[in-house]
Amino acid sequence: MKIDLNADLGEGFASDSELLTLVSSANIACGFHAGDAQTMLTCVREALKNGVAIGAHPSFPDRDNFGRTAMVLPPETVYAQTLYQIGALGAIVQAQGGVMRHVKPHGMLYNQAAKDPRLAQAIAKAVHDYDSSLILVGLAGSELIRAGERYRLATRQEVFADRGYQADGSLVPRTQPGALILDEGQALAQTLGMVQAGRVKSVTGVWTNVTAQTVCIHGDGEYALAFARRLRAAFNARNIHVSF
């Protein structure tokens, strides 16, 4: 069995360099919620040095709240903003002799696109129009995955190690109890259950089926690095190979 292990990077946290030795893919902030040209360049170089697959991590334009503010924007605006951010990172990757492999939206853009078909279509179209060989990463079973499939993009269904799930397979909003799993043991057990058994227990106690093709660990978590090491060790002990 194999699994991709990804992290959201270039967001101003000190653990980026060390996380890049543990993950198989990196989603690099493109300036709309965090990061800038220099952080993008630094992350790209570090990812290439470690053989980590590079992806764009586009967001709503929301630096004040780290891309976590809900927004209602026309699909054409979301298309243009997504294309802009992908292109910015793509130029840096190309200049460094690398190849961009995937796109994963960030924060509220990701969450809204998981449920809003029009928003999901705008993102999928931007990815397709920029480079149809890119993989679109989205919440497992979401509208974003379906939109990617409609555009005949390769898709990768994502699960979260440290987030609580609702009975419908969506993430518990960060404003609600149970949104974040702070206990490492609980996060580890949830991750292994999703990867090995294809199911997750919701905050209401209902078991929900999920397709786990990539696991996200958040680089902004206080214990991100320690948890990443523990998760890699657990995967190794179970002959689960980490690769993009």
UniProtKB/Swiss-Prot annotation:
Keyword entries, A-Z: ATP-binding, Hydrolase, Nucleotide-binding
First-tier enzyme category under EC: hydrolase
Lineage of producing organism: Bacteria, Pseudomonadati, Pseudomonadota, Gammaproteobacteria, Enterobacterales
EC number: 3.5.2.9
MF annotations from Gene Ontology: 5-oxoprolinase (ATP-hydrolyzing) activity; ATP binding
GO biological process: carbohydrate metabolic process
Family: Belongs to the LamB/PxpA family.
Catalytic activity, as annotated: 5-oxo-L-proline + ATP + 2 H2O = L-glutamate + ADP + phosphate + H(+)
Assembly with partners or alone: Forms a complex composed of PxpA, PxpB and PxpC.
Protein name: 5-oxoprolinase subunit A
InterPro entries with a match to the protein in the record: Glyco_hydro/deAcase_b/a-brl, LamB/YcsF/PxpA-like
Known function: Catalyzes the cleavage of 5-oxoproline to form L-glutamate coupled to the hydrolysis of ATP to ADP and inorganic phosphate.
The organism's place on the tree of life at top rank: Bacteria
Oxidoreductase as UniProt keyword: no
UniProt keyword Manganese present: no
Species name: Salmonella arizonae (strain ATCC BAA-731 / CDC346-86 / RSK2980)
